[in-house]
């Protein structure tokens, strides 16, 4: 498991630890951030180091039969390329194909169209993170181990608690709810025609845990090649329903609303 100290990584680690007898090799940079599973558990071994120092763990990588790769990087273009593309290729090269049964590779739903095909715009116009993920997916689809790969594509991820009291780390989306709540006094007056998908990290953990503890199944979808694709998300929820739910959560009265016209957006940007 890479990215083992992250929000999704810890939810998955906890699920696998509780629902299987698997031995977990947790690859992470800072053991102090591992809060949801005990570091001294007899079925847990820590691999402390950066994903870019892949060769340090060549022996461990050659011994595993399942890989769950959640680690990622964004912000700095060079680091994003090194972590999201170069390090992944090196990690795959150090795995033993005769022992390896499955790789669960975390990407993002932003690189696919509605037919689960790679989105050309992701490579052309995406952020450094999106572009790196799109390049890695393209290379994985052509890799000799492609038939053993399950590429998972989470939508927006909730996890942990807004107040930070959960043993699991708070996801960036959940963390942002505190800031969003400060603007409900304004948002409750507005209406917008838009929707989005989301998923909770606990649901991601259950899906990945079931994939990782059952016999690997090859991709059966026609026209997609050997690499299997799984998009993770709830049914779409509208922005208006989201604001309504947040208002109820925070005890803010819902009001009649007006459409968020372009000129109104520009006015709000200038005023606020």
Tell what function each PLM region has.
Residues 1-22:
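N-terminal Rossmann NAD(P)H-binding glycine-rich loop of SDR-like oxidoreductase domains
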Residues 20-33:
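Conserved glycine-rich Rossmann-like NAD(P)H-binding loop of the short-chain dehydrogenase/reductase
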Residues 40-90, 112-117:
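NAD(P)H-binding glycine-rich loop region in Rossmannoid oxidoreductase-like domains
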Residues 86-132, 150:
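Conserved Rossmann-fold NAD(P)-dependent oxidoreductase catalytic core, especially the SDR/UDP-sugar
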Residues 139-164:
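Conserved beta-loop-beta element that borders a ligand/cofactor-binding pocket
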Residues 174-199, 210:
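A conserved pocket-lining segment of Rossmann-fold NAD(P)-dependent short-chain dehydrogenase/reductase
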Residues 217-234, 243:
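A recurrent short beta-strand within the Rossmann-like NAD(P)-dependent oxidoreductase core
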Residues 243-272:
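Terminal hydrophobic/aromatic helix or amphipathic segment near a protein terminus
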């Amino acid at each position: 498991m890479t990215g083992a100290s992250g929000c999704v990584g810890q939810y998955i680690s906890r699920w696998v630890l509780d629902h299987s007898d698997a031995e977990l090799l947790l690859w992470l940079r800072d053991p102090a951030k591992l809060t949801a599973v005990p570091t001294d558990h007899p079925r847990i071994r820590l691999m402390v180091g950066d994903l870019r120092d892949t060769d340090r763990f060549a022996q461990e990588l050659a011994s595993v039969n399942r890989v769950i790769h959640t680690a990622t990087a964004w912000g700095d273009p060079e680091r994003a390329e090194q972590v999201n593309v170069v390090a992944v290729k090196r990690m795959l090269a150090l795995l033993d194909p005769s022992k390896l049964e499955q790789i669960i590779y975390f990407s993002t739903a932003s690189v696919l169209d509605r037919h689960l095909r790679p989105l050309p715009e992701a490579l052309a116009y995406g952020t450094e993170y999106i572009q790196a993920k799109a390049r890695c997916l393209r290379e994985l689809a052509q890799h000799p181990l492609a038939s053993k790969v399950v590429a998972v594509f989470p939508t927006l991820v909730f996890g942990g608690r807004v107040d930070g009291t959960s043993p699991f780390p708070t996801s960036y989306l959940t963390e942002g709810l505190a800031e969003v709540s400060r603007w409900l006094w304004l948002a409750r007056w507005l209406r917008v025609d838009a929707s989005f998908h989301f998923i909770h990290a606990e649901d991601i953990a259950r899906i990945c845990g079931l994939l990782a503890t059952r016999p690997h199944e090859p991709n059966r979808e026609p026209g997609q090649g050997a690499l299997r694709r799984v998009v993770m998300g709830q049914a779409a929820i509208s922005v208006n329903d989201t604001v309504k739910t947040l208002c109820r959560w925070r005890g803010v009265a819902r009001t009649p609303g007006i459409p968020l016209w372009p000129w109104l957006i520009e006015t709000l940007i200038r005023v606020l």
